[in-house]
Regions:
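Short, small-residue-biased leader/transition segments that mark boundaries at the very start
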Residues: 1-13
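Flexible, active-site-adjacent loop/turn segments at secondary-structure boundaries
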Residues: 3, 16-18, 132
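Pocket-edge positions in alpha/beta enzyme catalytic cores
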Residues: 4-5, 20, 62, 137
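Pocket-edge structural micro-motifs
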Residues: 7, 30, 49, 123-125
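Short, surface-exposed acidic-centric catalytic microdomains
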Residues: 17-66
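Glycine/proline-rich loop-helix segments at beta-alpha junctions forming the active-site rim
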Residues: 51-158
Length: 158
């Protein structure tokens, strides 16, 4: 199967040199319904950051990626991933960049109405453990969104 996903996010390359090799990644793989080996070694997943440089932390989360990075680098990187079937837009910066006029409200509303963005995009909240409060306030995410995401991922990779 030559399908791949693009996970668009604003995180910088971590010290380990491997994206999603942390608790956020554990949660993301759980949401996707795949194990670590499938995620890293199947050739089915691609990660394209919103910036290669981590801009630092702000009062309510990470600072935004540098302006112009995605415009300059994403078209070149996406040429290397010609068989993308689904793009996961993780967090507000990826969603704002890719959804343009499709943006309706905040991350929570985009995630709640994820079906409006299919089949091309699937907006997600960042899977950080820091989002425990968000998860508790939005039980519909685990009850409705995660099962739909898992079913879609399984359909694509099998």
């Amino acid at each position: 199967n030559t399908a791949s996903y693009t996970l668009s996010l604003h995180d910088a390359l971590p010290i380990s040199g491997i994206y999603w090799k942390d608790k956020s990644g554990d949660r993301l793989r759980e949401w996707l319904g795949v194990d670590e080996d499938t995620f890293y070694n199947s050739g089915l997943f691609a990660v394209i950051p919103m910036d290669f440089y981590f801009p630092g932390h702000g009062k309510s989360g990470d600072l935004p990626p540098r302006k112009g990075f995605a415009e300059k680098w994403h078209p070149q990187l996406l040429k290397e991933c010609p068989d993308i079937e689904l793009t996961l837009l993780i967090g507000q910066y990826a969603q704002a960049y890719y959804l343009h006029e499709k943006v309706s409200g905040k991350v929570t509303e985009r995630v709640r109405h994820f079906k409006n963005y299919l089949p091309e995009y699937f907006p997600l909240v960042h899977p950080s453990p820091r989002n425990q409060i968000w998860m508790a306030k939005n039980p519909w995410f685990a009850e409705q969104v995660v099962p739909d995401l898992q079913a879609l991922v399984q359909k694509i990779i099998h």
